[in-house]
Amino acid sequence: MLKRSLLFLTVLLLLFSFSSITNEVSASSSFDKGKYKKGDDASYFEPTGPYLMVNVTGVDGKGNELLSPHYVEFPIKPGTTLTKEKIEYYVEWALDATAYKEFRVVELDPSAKIEVTYYDKNKKKEETKSFPITEKGFVVPDLSEHIKNPGFNLITKVIIEKK
């Protein structure tokens, strides 16, 4: 009787331990790995292909710092147009990542621009391109022959106010 009880408990424990492994495997396989590249840390995935990195500081109309959210990366596609309206939308998402629905974008710094730095294989030197932020916008260039993951950086101050 004791042998049967021990055998039953052993089988039961093995059954539960394998079910937890199966659940972890199925949960991890549901993540779409094609859109992201694994970085150094197992919990960090960066977008593959071009991306817009938004790193802003939220200030009031007098220049006093109100919010300094972490940077946020958004996948973008070559050939798409980034207008001022779209960029403000991305900035608001970055603000929401720190203080959800608390602030709205009033205005981007007039000197704000988006920059991308890459090694130009034709010129054989590092190249930096700047794109002004306008209502008309700019077309995201295809830099795939020079770099796999071009990061278009927006690093600026943004005038914000409470909603």
UniProtKB/Swiss-Prot annotation:
Cell compartments where the protein resides:
Secreted
- Keywords of this protein's UniProt record, alphabetized? Plasminogen activation, Secreted, Signal
Q: Which Gene3D superfamilies match?
A: 3.10.20.130
- GO CC entries: extracellular region
What SUPFAM superfamilies does the entry give?
Staphylokinase/streptokinase
Signal peptide boundaries: 1-27
Q: Which Pfam families does this chain map to? A: Staphylokinase
Domain of life, per the record? Viruses
**Which InterPro entries did the record assign?**
SAK (IPR004093), SAK/SK_sf (IPR036120)
Describe the function of this protein.
Potent plasminogen activator that converts plasminogen into plasmin. It forms a 1:1 complex with plasmin, which in turn activates other plasminogen molecules.
As for family, the record states:
Belongs to the staphylokinase family.
Q: What is this protein called?
A: Staphylokinase
